[in-house]
UniProtKB/Swiss-Prot annotation:
Homodimer. One of its GO terms (cellular component) is cytosol. It comes from Parabacteroides distasonis (strain ATCC 8503 / DSM 20701 / CIP 104284 / JCM 5825 / NCTC 11152). It is an enzyme of class 6 (ligase). One of its GO terms (biological process) is methionyl-tRNA aminoacylation. A motif ('HIGH' region) lies at residues 15-25. This is Methionine--tRNA ligase. Belongs to the class-I aminoacyl-tRNA synthetase family. MetG type 1 subfamily. It holds the Pfam family tRNA-synt_1g. A motif ('KMSKS' region) lies at residues 332-336. HAMAP family: Met_tRNA_synth_type1 (MF_00098). Residues 578-679 form the tRNA-binding domain. PANTHER family: METHIONINE--TRNA LIGASE, METHIONINE--TRNA LIGASE, CYTOPLASMIC.
Amino acid sequence: MEKHFKRTLITTALPYANGPVHIGHLAGVYVPADIYARYLRLKGEEVLMIGGSDEHGVPITLRAKKEGITPQDVVDRYHGIIKKSFEEFGITFDIYSRTTSATHHQMASDFFRTLYDKGEFIEKTSEQYYDEEAKQFLADRYIMGTCPHCGNEKAYGDQCEACGTSLSPTDLIDPKSAISGSKPVMRETKHWYLPLDKWEPFLRKWILEDHKEWKPNVYGQCKSWLDMGLQPRAVSRDLDWGIPVPVEGAEGKVLYVWFDAPIGYISNTKELLPDSWETWWKDPETKMVHFIGKDNIVFHCIVFPSMLKAEGSYNLPENVPANEFLNLEGDKISTSRNWAVWLNEYLVDMPGKQDVLRYVLTANAPETKDNDFTWKDFQARNNNELVAILGNFVNRALVLTDKYFEGKVPVAGELTDYDRQTLKDFADVKENVERLLDTYHFRDAQKEAMNLARIGNKYLADMEPWKLAKTDMPRVATIMNIALQITANLAIAFEPFLPFSMEKLNKMLNVEPLGWNRLGATDLLEAGHQLGKAELLFEKIEDSVIEAQVQKLLDTKKANEEANYKAKPIRENIEFDDFMKLDIRVGTVLECVKVPKADKLLQFRIDDGLEKRTIVSGIAQHYKPEELVGKQVCFIANLAPRKLKGIVSEGMILSAENFDGKLAVITPEKEVKPGSEVK
């Protein structure tokens, strides 16, 4: 039986304040959450959308140590960047706060203390890695090593970013401290644990029986965790940055970030509504929906519900529509590798194009499987869909009305069967979009909204009012009235998806925003209503703009390759006498040309001090022939001649291969006589 609620509380995963927000965050969490919140508000429902920065945890302390500043300096900087970016991008939080706030510290401490006083924790001592040089325990990302699953040598103690596997520090092969680089030792330490196994029977019924409607990826991951059997999970860590564990004997220990962060949803609500926050968290007529990425499923479906159940007075989430991951140009997005499209940079590089990114991220939303963002697809969806379909229809409807009816909505006359079918087709859009949004299928909902523009384009193309204008203006009036009703419907249907563009469209239509209940109506614009000035809703994105973005990524990839470069192992030793057999000389390049039908080969004429010799070298992809004429190069002079592409090569030019595969010809520092020996 379908449940009915008085209000909806939307929570969004708290981004770590150790860097800006990127497109993976947007596609997985914030764009779908904002679409849902805007949709419910359009329906006139009571909604709260809660967000905030996660400002505790090891990634933040590591960045602070790397930059030589305090963790507070780090979170102050990035909280400001993140909050400003969200505002400019149109993410409509009712509050966007932070976990370093006084309200949150008190709320998290009180929550822990309530569970502690009720005897809901297990206190036990265990062995954990300890850095003797830095004199501290190594939690999570304070320890690095080789991933046992994929062999990545830079896996963290909580996760391997290369393969995405969740890890424990003891899983790592050849672990090292991320602080000192030293090999850690095992040392005993005391912590508090939440016994998840105690709540396993409840979770099995609540999820596996009562919430079979959850997305398959969410339901399936929860089932896997439950089938493996839940174990007690530590709620504290040996760190000096975070919320201190509020009990005696817990000096030097803070609340583990996974325990601390979700309480941020509660504390942020309390910060916004100090007198009525409990209505949103404890009234069973409130529906709570968590928007998260797949890496947070276990925390929001297993751990946080166990915490709430242990406390005893809170609602549990009604749905957790987690998304999979968005990749970038075929590679996993990574903050540490700077492999991302950062929102704050996008807003500078692409001014006024918030809706283009919202549209593309929704069209490529990783709702059921990992998906990929490419700049070429971004350009294609803008030019071929937003410009050519939606923008084209809106522009034609408004421009033709201005041309034939002085910008006033004309009176519709007698309808044809085709008119009636068109009206029926767009009247059905409301039910379709609504059904998809209610079930968190945002990608398909946006596609259905775009179908409305396709209906409009087809209608105008089939009716050809520009031809009828010469003979039948009453018929043109009917056609344009219907086209304008479709346009006004588009302003409603797309508002959750493209809010900036729909604000612009409402100005062009000269109307106030209409409610969701009016979607599908055929009388949104009255006859005689004066329209505003027609403008282009979207603009074409040129190749040069996309090429600049692709180049940024290529530069990042090159920087990563350089940072991760490892020289090849030294080959086995040879005898000194064997080396002395090589006759390495310096020669001057007299001529250099490309070898026909050979992409990699250059043919050299070289003065070796005794005669002129020919050498063929495979460096054509690294140098233009004219760049080498007149230069001096080192070459092996006594290599046996051999034929390459029919040319006898009398030696080998020496070059060094860089980390990126580029070759650099070896030359003497100062000019020497041709034929000089290299010793």
